[in-house]
Amino acid sequence: MSYTMLNNEAIRKYDYATESLEGAALSFIRDLCEGLRFDKNKATSFTENNLDFDGKSLKANQIPYNMEKDIDRLCLENAVNRFLKSGKKEDAFDVYFCYLEMFVGDYQKTRRMIELLSEYEVNGSSLLMKHRDHYSHSVYVFALGLAIYKSNELYQKVYKEYYKISDDKEAAAHYLQYWGLSSLFHDIGYPFELPFEQVCSYFEVEGDKRESRPFVAYHDLDAFISIDDKAKEKLSKIYPGRSFNTTNDVFAYVLNEKMGDVYGFTEDQMRTFLVEKPTQPNKFNHYMDHAYFSATILFRKLFEEMDIEMHSEHLDALTAILMHNSLYKFCIAHYKSEGNKPFKAELHPLAYMLMLCDELQCWDRTAYGRNSKKELHPMGCTFDFSGNNIKAIYLFDEKEMAKVNHFKDEYIEWLQNQNPGKGKAPELKAFSGMYIKENGVSKFQNDIELIVDLSKIHLNVETGFAEHIHSGNRSYLSNSNFINLYKFAIILNGRWGNDGWKRAKLAGQEELYLSDSKVVEEFAEGFKNLSLEYKLSNINQAKAFAKYLNMIGCFYTDKAVDFEQVDRFTDDELISIGKAEHQRWLQEHYDMGWTYGKPEKDKRDFERKHWDMIPDFSGFDVSDEAAEQNYIRLDKAEQDKDTDPMECMLAMLKTYDGLRIYRL
């Protein structure tokens, strides 16, 4: 049984190929992680007679404790599935949220570093010559690492031996926690690299070198890298007899212990690299290493601001992040030199997996930079992980065939006319790096094999063409702003049954009411007490607003535009929104294993039955027609539950984002 505290018959079974990215990643969560975060002293099966009710759902003590943990795991599984289907950053958000709630705690304390990464990239990266998405990219990397672990017995063996874990499920749970930390947060330091690249791009002249341009460097970092007394005490328990004053000290020690002898560097040499990375980028080919900032920020966030318990595995995750970009390639291994030693998983399993997955994940990455938009990048990738190997077919948009054929013609002409060793070959990034092969291996594949040891895991990279996989998924005129999405969810939940909100709505003073910080604080406390399932439901309700606006011919923006401004929806628009929101609610509940029933209200969450579900429904996918028929059978009070939140969104967008809604 994959979910021992739930009715597995009510949970969707996937038809993905077992060795595909989707099939392997979801199977990792469902099958390998059985019993994830369980308290073994409480009921571990819902068929047991003596069930505790120590878990929370809509309220505390509604369900068994381990049932809550199984529901959390199903939330994560569904979030990963939604993201792999859509590739949308809105769905990537759910994966971050689930992980933070499950393994780190209180999203409120960690939200800024995730939300700002997305906002910085969207708003600042268009000034760069080259830049592509890192927000959704990190979630793809996370899923890829789950899939490789699930399908690769060789890596599983290395991981279990390294961490001295014999039980398969315990090892998978351990991997999920620390791989999630390594992968999902490996690029959070990008806001430090973006200003550096913006200055470089501003002064860029074709044919010149970076050395001739002004550059940004970071100084006065003492407060940023210093370690407070609480963190020092935690470190002393992991490394007795050692004292550390800065994060540079910690990282240099850990890396030297793991691989200093293999790669011939000392602790002092590594510390010097780390000191100079942000302060003297001119010593590192005039590039700023975001990985350094990602690891340092995360250390401070986890062990100083949040004051969580520290384990050596946390430092493994942080040093994996630290290594994944240029530190390993150019300071440790010098990976393009004759003496290069491809990195072995046995030295640092998390670092190995992060470098491998970070290199493999180059598909479906939104291009922001001016040159990046002109290049041809894969929009999808199919994987086959069978036989402990990795076969990747990178899929390019078939609509770009004219561009590809033009490149091929140029390349053939170059081959026929070139003098040996002279003339630069034509390029079409990233297609040419995967398509052109020497001795059966593309440059793209060869670079990966120089970085990580694939002598036992055979990698095969091919190219193909297909219709755009995510066509239509990013077509809304209104784009979600993650800065206030969490606050929107808090308000949507808090207004339920709130007399103050009702009075403000009747008086037309919604914006004034929502501007009261005490009200928001009260709502935030109530939101914290919800289970992960209910928090996600409110978040996804807020995210759906852009879709509903698009459906009725409206959009929101912070720009002054010559369209009719919307202060209230028409009755017909509300009916359309209500039906669409009911379909979303139904689909969400079927995905979470709910079915139709009429239990007593206080038993509803335990039995996972609801009277607003569709009677006699036996499937998992809710069509618009089925949702509409079910919506019609509901009374007015129930229908209003689907429209009231959207009217609330009108006020919230004005209050928190300074946005206005317009009708096309």
Where are these regions (language model features)?
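C-terminal effector/catalytic modules and regulatory tails appended to multi-domain proteins
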Residues: 2-112, 340-346, 351, 357-360, ...
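Divalent metal-dependent catalytic cores for phosphoryl transfer on phosphate-bearing substrates
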Residues: 169-382
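Alpha-helical propensity feature that highlights long, continuous alpha-helices across diverse contexts
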Residues: 397, 411, 421-664
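Phosphate/oxyanion-binding active-site loops and adjacent basic polyanion-contact surfaces
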Residues: 130-149, 183, 286-294, 534-537, ...
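Short helix/loop segment immediately N-terminal to the Walker
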Residues: 152-173, 308-310, 336-338, 507-515
